[in-house]
């Protein structure tokens, strides 16, 4: 399988690159900075470019099987929302995918993005409330990404996480689609593992699993 990863230099992104290569995937890692990813492998291609450079984005996207984003917003507590660079990146990626393919798109978010399956519980409601109060720009990024995803023509999956700071991987991970009880904490390793496995899960198309440690 040929996969392109945006956000490859982040902590979750680097884990996902490593896991994908170990699984035999051909990986294209998109980075905004050269020499930012200290991984070498015969099946790894690194493309350096801006997140709004349509030429570079097209080079990274076309003729792949699945596109994955682990891009995340800056957690600023400033009340004024000036711009939404991560949402703008999603807009560009989605636009190119709709024009040239592929159709399969996975992105990382929080339960600030709501799923139609969501029922009232802590994991589906608290993240949105806290983000709106504490991180206005992050909240605005998530809501705009939600709008872009839900109105796209892609076969998308949104993997939702809360507090990916758990140091142990526990006994693996579980997911809730929002309609069953979920938990608040997850390790970055398990987030990456879930996203990798989601590339093979057609049953998660147009779903928003919340992943958490067992």
Where are these regions (language model features)?
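N-terminal Rossmann NAD(P)H-binding glycine-rich loop of SDR-like oxidoreductase domains
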Residues: 3-23
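NAD(P)H-binding glycine-rich loop region in Rossmannoid oxidoreductase-like domains
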Residues: 4, 35-92, 96-99, 199-203
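Conserved Rossmann-fold NAD(P)-dependent oxidoreductase catalytic core, especially the SDR/UDP-sugar
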Residues: 26, 34, 88, 92-137, ...
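Conserved catalytic-site region of short-chain dehydrogenase/reductase
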Residues: 76, 111-117, 164-167
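Substrate-positioning beta->alpha
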Residues: 86, 141, 159, 186-196, ...
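Glycine/proline-rich active-site loop of Rossmann-fold NAD(P)-dependent oxidoreductases
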Residues: 119, 168-173, 198-207
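Conserved beta-loop-beta element that borders a ligand/cofactor-binding pocket
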Residues: 144-167
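Core catalytic loop region at the nicotinamide-binding pocket of NAD(P)H-dependent oxidoreductases
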Residues: 156, 201-214
């Amino acid at each position: 399988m040929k996969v392109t990863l945006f956000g490859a230099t982040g902590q979750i992104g680097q884990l996902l690159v490593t896991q994908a290569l170990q699984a035999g995937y051909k990986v294209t890692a998109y980075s905004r900075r050269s020499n930012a990813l200290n991984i070498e492998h015969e099946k790894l291609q690194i493309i350096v470019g801006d997140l709004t450079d349509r030429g570079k984005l097209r080079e990274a996207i076309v003729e792949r099987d699945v596109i994955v984003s682990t891009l995340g917003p800056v957690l600023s507590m400033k009340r004024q929302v000036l711009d939404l660079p991560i949402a703008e990146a999603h807009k560009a990626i989605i636009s190119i995918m709709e024009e040239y393919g592929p159709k399969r798109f996975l992105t990382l978010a929080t339960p600030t993005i709501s799923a139609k399956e969501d029922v009232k519980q802590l994991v589906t409601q608290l993240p949105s409330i806290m983000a709106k109060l504490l991180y206005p720009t992050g909240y605005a990024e998530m809501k705009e990404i939600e709008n872009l995803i839900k109105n796209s023509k892609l076969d998308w999956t949104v993997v939702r996480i809360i507090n990916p700071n758990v140091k142990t991987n526990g006994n693996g991970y579980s997911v809730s689609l929002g309609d069953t009880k979920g938990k608040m904490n997850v390790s970055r390793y398990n987030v990456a593992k879930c996203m990798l496995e989601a590339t093979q899960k057609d049953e998660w198309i147009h779903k928003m699993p919340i992943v958490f440690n067992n």
